[in-house]
Amino acid sequence: MMQDVSSSPVSPADDSLSNSEEEPDRQQPPSGKRGGRKRRSSRRSAGGGAGPGGAAGGVGGGDEPGSPAQGKRGKKSAGCGGGAGGGGSSSGGGSPQSYEELQTQRVMANVRERQRTQSLNEAFAALRKIIPTLPSDKLSKIQTLKLAARYIDFLYQVLQSDELDSKMASCSYVAHERLSYAFSVWRMEGAWSMSASH
């Protein structure tokens, strides 16, 4: 009789233990067998140190038997935000430095571009002062360059011709005025209109 009594309390305890062991197994199917694999990998990573198993173990550790929905959320967050966070931690804070370096490079490139365009505009303004222009001229940069090339050609032709003598060359102001007038007349005759149309 004592054996029966002693065996009867043990058997319910064994049943309760077996039930308690079976209950997590029944509750784990929503998370699947992956949770068990991740737990095994987490044990391996805990014994072996850091590695890819450690990241999987961290996700597996979040899968509690009573909260399968939290496990799915943990997987989503690990897949989306965890990847970016892992990249930042693996680079050791290198990504903010690279972003700052990119920003400084962009700022320096913008400064250089502004300086280049400013110096280019100043050079074109000086060139427009030298080239005789008509009051109706609103020249673009390419038209200014074409007009400068025409003016150089015109000056070369004037120097080669015998129309201007040394008296005109003695006074630069008069020579410049006459050259400007002659160049304007030369432009009005159609020599510039053909090149400006292109």
From Swiss-Prot:
Residues 46-64, 79-95 have a biased composition (Gly residues). Keywords: Activator, Biological rhythms, Developmental protein, Differentiation, DNA-binding, Myogenesis, Nucleus, Repressor, Transcription, Transcription regulation. It comes from the Eukaryota. Coiled coil: none annotated. Residues 34-43 have a biased composition (Basic residues). InterPro entries: bHLH_dom (IPR011598), E-box_TF_Regulators (IPR050283), HLH_DNA-bd_sf (IPR036638), TWIST1_bHLH (IPR047093). Residues 1-18 have a biased composition (Low complexity). GO terms for biological process: cell differentiation; muscle organ development; negative regulation of DNA-templated transcription; rhythmic process. Residues 157-187 are annotated as: Sufficient for transactivation activity. GO terms for cellular component: nucleus. One of its GO terms (molecular function) is protein dimerization activity. Efficient DNA binding requires dimerization with another bHLH protein. Homodimer or heterodimer with E proteins such as TCF3. ID1 binds preferentially to TCF3 but does not interact efficiently with TWIST1 so ID1 levels control the amount of TCF3 available to dimerize with TWIST and thus determine the type of dimer formed. This is Twist-related protein 1. It comes from Eulemur fulvus fulvus.
